[in-house]
Amino acid sequence: MSEIFEDKTENGKVRPWRERKIENVRYAEYLAILEFKRAHDVRGCGEVLRFRKIGEHLKLYQTWFCHKRLCPLCNWRRSMKNSSQLKQIIAEAVAREPKGRFLFLTLTVKNAHSAEELKVSLRALTKAFNKLTRYKKVTKNLLGYLRSTEITVNEQDGSYNQHLHVLLFVKSSYFKNSNNYLAQAEWAKLWQKALKVDYEPVVHVQAVKANKRKGTDSLQASAEETAKYEVKSADYMTADDERNLVVIKNLEYALAGTRQISYGGLLKQIKQDLKLEDVENGDLVHVGDEDYTKEQMEAAEEVVAKWDFNKQNYFIW
């Protein structure tokens, strides 16, 4: 009998390959029902995983990922890569501007109730954010930023709550006096102006403590919030198949041609200087979780895991 495959992190936590692959297969089934052309390709995502075993650690070195925006397997790998890149960028930003401070900003708009409305709203969000970062009150202390889009689905009415999470890197002078500092109410007014809407949108801003390891105001928590999934699979993998089909169809339409993450200012420059690839279109095999030399990888034992569609698990091959 074949051995069940298990991949653990250095601290002993089991990586969720099985859970993500089960969701991936279900997602592929939904795409097939909706008659999307690539449904069969999606089903083959991460079917065979090839690892190198170095000590007790497994390092993925070969597989095929479908790169679909809503694929739970690809989304998991993407969030890992985003997180890894962001850690490198933040470390370099602090080294270059040691007096710089971080803010975590959440910018919202009214919910969208259809695929078309969501698509239009996502474009408006990006356009308004670009305007916001050009306002004099913002630019005078802004060093750089990372902006990411998140969409949640309302359980009651099925509407879409699209919002931006922004990690702002600002000069220390931002906190010095009222001429530089922007209170939450001022951020809300500027965001309303950028959006060109007749209602006051909900905005939340807080200073982030770079040296604090845990808590919602820690830099790590803010970085993780910014680098996480665009849409949680739980929002389109509910017990209600009919609802899931509607949500997936709407999201596939609305997200086409959009980007989840963008960098600006110093953080964008650092990303270029570090030669970090574009996560949205890039390699999801190497996500920056571990770095080994070519010699180490070539000398290591190979471990191959293959997905069994009937038993719904990976087995050592």
From Swiss-Prot:
One of its GO terms (biological process) is DNA replication. Keywords: DNA replication, Plasmid. Belongs to the Gram-positive plasmids replication protein type 1 family. It comes from Lactiplantibacillus plantarum. This is Protein rep. DNA binds at Y229. Produces a single-strand nick in a specific site of the plasmid, and this nick results in single-strand replication by rolling circle mechanism. GO terms for molecular function: DNA binding. It comes from the Bacteria. Pfam families: Rep_1.
